[in-house]
């Protein structure tokens, strides 16, 4: 597990905890799974064709795709809740963060709808109704959502982690 990355998740979890204390273990759990998935993606990419085609690797790939699927669902619900709390006035966000959380929610929603409902997201009518999983050599598990358009779990996790790290900085500077 990339320890530095996991430490960033631990540190950033307090930003979500300001909004809802239960979000702290949720963010930390997402971070732990994120680091595990990155480790497994890196390990898999180092295998030769024969090794990557084994029955064991097929099972491990199924596990990675499934865990990535659940990671996306959990992360989406976290982001959706942050966005909803801000929109209903239940919490405040530092300047500029409301737009960032809304943009991240839309990005995640573009993937979440076809992987859960198996239909096209209304905002993206030309997308595929089903997002088929694939492997991006540089980023691990990805989903093909439209012609020439893929969303990787790693891309979403990087964006969520960056958002939370920056949110924590924004909350800290607001208090000073």
Question: How should these model regions be labeled?
Answer:
Residues 1-107, 138-176:
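Amphipathic alpha-helical interface segments
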Residues 99-140:
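Histidine-centered, metal-coordinating catalytic motifs and their short helical/loop contexts
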């Amino acid at each position: 597990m990339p320890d530095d990355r996991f430490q960033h998740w631990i540190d950033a979890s307090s930003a979500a905890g300001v909004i809802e204390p239960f979000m702290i273990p949720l963010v930390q759990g997402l971070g732990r799974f994120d680091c595990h998935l990155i480790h497994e993606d890196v390990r898999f990419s180092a295998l030769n064709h024969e090794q990557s085609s084994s029955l064991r690797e097929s099972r491990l790939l199924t596990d990675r795709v499934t865990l990535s699927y659940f990671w996306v669902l959990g992360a989406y619900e976290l982001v959706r809740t942050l966005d909803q709390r801000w929109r209903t006035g239940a919490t405040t966000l530092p300047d500029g963060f409301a737009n960032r959380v809304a943009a991240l929610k839309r990005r995640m929603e573009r993937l979440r709808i076809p992987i859960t409902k198996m239909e096209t997201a209304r905002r993206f009518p030309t997308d595929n109704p089903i997002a088929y999983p694939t492997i991006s050599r540089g980023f691990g598990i990805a989903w093909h959502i439209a012609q020439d358009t893929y969303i990787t779990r790693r891309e979403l996790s990087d964006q969520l982690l960056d958002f939370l790290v920056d949110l924590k900085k924004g909350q800290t500077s607001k208090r000073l």
